[in-house]
Amino acid sequence: MGKALIQRSAMPGLGLSAGITLTMISIVVLLPIGALLARGLSFGPEAVWEVVNRDRVWAALHLSFRLSLFAALFNLAFGTLLAWVLVRYNFPGRRILDAMVDLPFALPTAVAGIALTALYAPNGFLGAMAKDLGWKIAYTQWGILLALIFVGLPFVTRTVQPVIAEIEKEVEEASATLGASRAYTLRRVIFPMLLPAALTGFALSLARAVGEYGSVIFIAANIPMRTEIAPLLIVIQLEEYNYDGAAAIGLAMLVISFAVLFLINLIQIWSRRRTGNV
C-alpha cells in the first residue's frame, strides 16, 4: 500500500489529463490552424498560388523571413552572451539589467514601435547621429530589423540562462587543468551544452519575428516591394475585404514557418543526441 501511495501522481489520471490537454490544444491551436487551412484551400490550390505568386506578395514574404532570420541569428549570438554575463558576473546594476530583459514581453508592441521610431527617426537622438554619418535607420529595412531584434531578444536570453546556471565552474577549471585553452573549452565543452537551449531560443525568436506587426508598422515606411512586411499585407487584404487573399498569404506564411521550425527541430534532436541529452 505504501508503494502505491508513493507511485500515485498528484495530477489526475492519464485519461482525464490527456483529455483536458487535447481539448485545450484543439481549441487554442489546432482549430484555428485548421480553419486557416480550410479557408486558404477552399478556393483551390491554383487560386492560392495565383495570389502568392504576385511580385508584391513575394517581396513581402521574402522581406519578412529574411529579416526575421537575421534578427534571430543576432539574438542567438547576443542573447547567449547577455545570458552568460547575467549569470556568471556580478556588477553594479546587474539586477536592473536582468529585469530590463523582460521589457519586450510586457511592453505593447505598438508602444515599442513608437519608442523605436522616436529614437531612430531622422530627428531622434540616435537617428540624428546616424543621419550625420549618412545612415538612415527609421523607415528603412534597418528599422524593421531593429524592431525584430527588440521583440525577440528575451526569448534567447531567458531560454539559455537556466542552462548556463547549471554548468558548474569546475567544468571549465577541469578543462583548463588538462591544458585546454579558453577557445577550446568554449567550443568543445561549453557550446555543446548550450546548443539545444540556444536553438530553442533561436526558434522562438524567429517565430516571434515572423509574426510581428505592431512595432514594425511604426518604424517601417510600409512601402510596397521595399519595406512592406507580410503581416501588414494580410491586414491590407482584410481592410479591402479580400478575405481569400489574406487567407492565401497566411497559408503561405504557415507553410514556410512550419518548414523552417521543423528543420530547426531536427537540428535540436541531432544536437541532443550528440551531447547525450536525448
Describe the residue ranges of each PLM region.
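Hydrophobic alpha-helical transmembrane segments of multipass integral membrane proteins
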Residues: 27, 62, 66-78, 82, ...
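Transmembrane alpha-helices
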Residues: 18-24, 73, 99, 103, ...
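Transmembrane-helix boundary motif in ABC transporter permease subunits
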Residues: 3-9, 70-101, 114, 118, ...
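Interhelical loop and adjacent transmembrane-helix boundary motif
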Residues: 9-14, 48, 55, 213-263, ...
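Membrane-interfacial helix termini and adjacent extracytoplasmic/periplasmic loops
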Residues: 2-7, 45-53, 58, 93-94, ...
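C-terminal transmembrane helix and the adjacent membrane-cytosol boundary/short C-terminal tail
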Residues: 3-5, 16-20, 31, 35, ...
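Membrane-helix interface segments
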Residues: 89-97, 125-126, 140, 170, ...
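Periplasmic/extracellular loop-to-transmembrane helix junction in inner-membrane transport proteins
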Residues: 3-15, 36-73, 88-89, 237-243
